[in-house]
From Swiss-Prot:
Name of this chain's protein: ATP synthase subunit beta
PROSITE patterns listed in its UniProt record: ATPASE_ALPHA_BETA
Family of the protein in this entry: Belongs to the ATPase alpha/beta chains family.
Gene Ontology annotations for the cellular component aspect, listed alphabetically: plasma membrane; proton-transporting ATP synthase complex
Keywords: ATP synthesis, ATP-binding, Cell inner membrane, Cell membrane, CF(1), Hydrogen ion transport, Ion transport, Membrane, Nucleotide-binding, Translocase, Transport
PANTHER family reported for this sequence: ATP SYNTHASE (PTHR15184), ATP SYNTHASE SUBUNIT BETA, MITOCHONDRIAL (PTHR15184:SF71)
Gene that this sequence comes from: atpD
Length: 467
């Protein structure tokens, strides 16, 4: 830490102006420390980040915590470095905030290894261009919305359709099957949800393989605009230094953009369309471009995307779409049928649902499943008005198979065992493809629909029917 000391000259909400001696201005993105007794009794407990040089030896900074209690003339220490996060084993099983301080009440976190949160994206020469499928063990995702290793997937869904459970199951499967690390970034989410997630992960035993980095709705915009970068830094350490395949969950990526918009006007920038910051694309790009596969390891991202007023043309979701490799859409109609995970098989898309990446057989089966379900959807109006008896024999077979496929897309989850009483199942991709192929080929037309509900592989369905 340098011995450069400045003083507070102006406070405007989350934005603080600090004056330094001539020739001693800290660089942009440098972390400065102020002691704010309103937060707690610790020294240097408020971190502010340099955003602009205003002239007259004054820098404009964004606060990472509340600025209530700051007064003009307060001393400000220059750390000479950006905000840093504790990385490696120290971050696992813990809940940290944007500046790497623990918020779980379990004592201090070792800062033996730290990394700055602002880092360049990997160079083109370091990036891995081969496309590999990341097996999640969740049938509907592996079959119809395959995740590219090192890719970015968007998870779209309203409240109560199962986003969190799918996330937790993925954390569990990556930890159990791949021995992988997961990082969860809670960006501007409800504190209650963050608390629930922590306790559920603790109870299901996946917490030791995960790092939770939270910046909830109550935090100032500075923290919410940086917490995704803090979490990504933890993930990058596991990828670049330990050569791991890491999964990062960001809930919610919209709040990252929203926080940037909140501080943008205070920094004197002219707002862009719909009041967003003019730097929207570059802010989001700086985060998204760091999420990639390199020759050392990979970071695969699952991002929850809130769509304001269901308007997909809003600049925030529209800019996010440009970065995504695929979208998993969760449907309330499917959840109402009791089918979980409630992924909409006709609305969800993946860039790598292509024979060149997943193989001819997988591609053919996936498309056949979608065609059967689409035909069933088209026939539903006729069935509702005239009943099943008016359908042709061919259509009756299609409807019966579609209903079996629909039920077979459900699956018992490990993390939901406590609620359902059913043991969870992890299904390998080859078993998933084979199972769905057998249903499409009519091999199991004699089994009742109920046999396909909440089972793993097709063998479990056959055993359930014999039951």
């Amino acid at each position: 830490m340098s011995d450069n000391i400045g003083k507070v000259v102006q406070v405007m909400g989350p934005v603080v102006d600090v004056e330094f001696e001539p020739g001693k201005l800290p660089a942009i993105l440098t972390a400065l420390l102020i002691t704010n007794t309103v937060i707690n009794d610790e020294a240097d407990n408020l971190v502010v980040e340099v955003a602009q040089h205003l002239g007259d030896n004054v820098v404009r900074t964004i606060a990472m915590d509340v600025t209530d209690g700051l007064v003009r003339g307060m001393p400000v220490k220059d750390t000479g470095a950006p905000i840093t996060m504790p990385v490696g084993a120290a971050s696992l099983g813990r809940v940290l905030n944007v500046v790497g301080k623990p918020v779980d009440g379990l004592g201090p976190v070792s800062r033996e290894k730290t990394m700055p949160i602002h880092r360049p994206a990997p160079l083109f020469t370091e990036q891995d261009t081969s496309v590999n499928v990341l097996e999640t063990g969740i049938k509907v995702i592996d079959l119809l919305v395959p995740f590219p290793r090192g890719g970015k997937m968007g998870l779209f869904g309203g409240a109560g359709v199962g986003k969190t459970v799918i996330m937790m199951e993925m954390v569990n499967n990556i930890a159990m099957q791949h021995g992988g690390i997961s990082v969860f970034a809670g960006v501007g989410e409800r504190t209650r949800e963050g608390n629930d997630l922590y306790h559920e992960m603790k109870d299901s035993g996946v917490l030791p393989k995960a790092a939770l980095i939270y910046g909830q709705m109550t935090e100032p915009p500075g923290a919410r605009a940086r917490v995704a970068l803090s979490a990504l830094t933890c993930a990058e350490y596991f990828r670049d230094v330990e050569g791991q395949d890491v999964l990062i969950f960001i809930d919610n990526i919209f709040r990252f953009t929203q926080a940037g918009a909140e501080v943008s006007a205070l920094l004197g920038r002219i707002p862009s369309a719909v009041g967003y910051q003019p730097t929207l694309a570059v802010d989001l790009g700086g985060l998204q471009e760091r999420i990639t596969s390199t020759d050392k390891g990979s970071i695969t991202a699952v991002q929850c995307v809130y769509v304001p007023a269901d308007d997909l043309t809003d600049p925030a979701p529209a800019t996010t779409f440009a970065h995504l490799d695929g979208t998993v859409v969760l449907s309330r109609q499917i959840a109402e049928l009791g089918i979980y995970p409630s992924v909409d098989p006709l609305d969800s898309t993946s860039r790598i649902l292509d024979a060149a990446y997943i193989g001819e057989e997988h591609y053919r089966v996936a498309r056949e499943v979608q065609q059967t379900l689409q035909k069933y959807k088209e026939l539903q109006d006729i069935i509702a008005i005239l009943g099943m008896d008016e359908l042709s024999d061919e259509d009756k077979v299609t409807v019966e198979r579609a209903r079996k496929l629909q039920r077979f897309l459900s699956q018992p989850f490990h993390v939901a065992e406590v609620f359902t009483g059913k043991p969870g199942s992890y299904v390998k991709i080859e078993d998933t493809v084979r199972s769905f192929k057998e249903i499409c080929d009519g091999k199991h037309d004699d089994l009742p629909e109920s046999a396909f509900y909440m089972v793993g592989s097709i063998e479990e369905a056959v055993a359930k029917a014999k039951g």
